[in-house]
């Protein structure tokens, strides 16, 4: 029997500064993966996390 999908989803958080910032420490776009509860958080997540490419704490938005 196939099991039902759980409430938790795996999402990807992407740095918003990496797309526009040209003065970066290294090229590329930083992404984090995390999970969220589908029932408690229905909207898109925005978290402030460290970006090694920008070398600062920046806002990371949910993309998937």
From Swiss-Prot:
Keyword field contains Ribosomal protein: yes
Protein name (Swiss-Prot/TrEMBL): Large ribosomal subunit protein bL33
Origin species: Crocosphaera subtropica (strain ATCC 51142 / BH68)
Any Pfam family the entry gives: Ribosomal_L33
Highest rank taxon of the organism: Bacteria
GO molecular function, one term: structural constituent of ribosome
InterPro entries: Ribosomal_bL33, Ribosomal_bL33_CS, Ribosomal_bL33_sf, Ribosomal_zn-bd
GO biological process, alphabetically ordered: translation
Keywords in alphabetical order: Ribonucleoprotein, Ribosomal protein
GO cellular component: cytoplasm; ribonucleoprotein complex; ribosome
PANTHER family: 50S RIBOSOMAL PROTEIN L33, CHLOROPLASTIC (PTHR43168), LARGE RIBOSOMAL SUBUNIT PROTEIN BL33C (PTHR43168:SF2)
Keyword Ribosomal protein carried by entry: yes
Family, per entry: Belongs to the bacterial ribosomal protein bL33 family.
Gene3D superfamilies found in the cross-reference section: Ribosomal protein L33
């Amino acid at each position: 029997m196939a099991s039902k999908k759980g409430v938790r989803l795996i999402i990807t958080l992407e740095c918003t500064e990496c797309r526009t910032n040209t003065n970066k420490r290294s090229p590329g776009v930083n992404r984090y993966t995390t999970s969220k509860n589908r029932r408690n958080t229905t909207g898109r997540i925005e978290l402030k996390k460290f970006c090694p490419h920008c070398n600062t704490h920046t806002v990371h938005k949910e993309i998937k």
